Amino acid sequence: MANLWEDLETGPDAPDVIYAVVECLKGERNKYEYDKDIPGVVLDRVLHSNVHYPSDYGFIPQSYYDDGDPFDVLVLVEDQTFPGCVIEARPVALMEMDDDGEQDDKVIAVPEEDPRYDDVEDVDDLTDQQKAEIAEFFETYKNLEADKETAVLGWGDAQAAKDAIEHAQDLYDEQFA
């Protein structure tokens, strides 16, 4: 079985078009994580708070971010996919986030093959409501976990997301290539 983090390239035209490996599903509370040692998707925990993922959430292959994990990506989808699904996606924003004192930014992306998002190219193309719902989730999803604190610090544009992806690719190459 292929290792989706190490064997799959970052994307067909990274950083402009990336692969997003789905771990967590839109509308669910289950926090799945890809375990490269199995390799497969395992249930990490069920969110303690009564909140649900606002969209499909996972990681970018062959990336490693400042928090010591593969780079996180939230792909805006109308309907959930499944854990382990690989989505060809276009980065449109970077949500800058702090998780317990560590930088834990998230790439916000849209599916390349969904016509509903053909006109979404940058952070300004997202509605205020979309950004508010995403931020609300990430600011509250750990509220009922002991001694956990998260904060959304701001929003970067598509270029900031692409620059962060290139940074995560460089870190991956330094650590694992």
From Swiss-Prot:
Gene Ontology CC annotations of this record: cytoplasm
Keywords: Cytoplasm, Hydrolase, Magnesium, Metal-binding
Gene Ontology molecular-function annotations: inorganic diphosphate phosphatase activity; magnesium ion binding
PANTHER family xref list: INORGANIC PYROPHOSPHATASE
Functional note: Catalyzes the hydrolysis of inorganic pyrophosphate (PPi) forming two phosphate ions.
Pfam families reported for this sequence: Pyrophosphatase
Protein species of origin: Halobacterium salinarum (strain ATCC 700922 / JCM 11081 / NRC-1)
Alphabetical list of HAMAP family matching this protein: Inorganic_PPase
Listed name of the protein: Inorganic pyrophosphatase
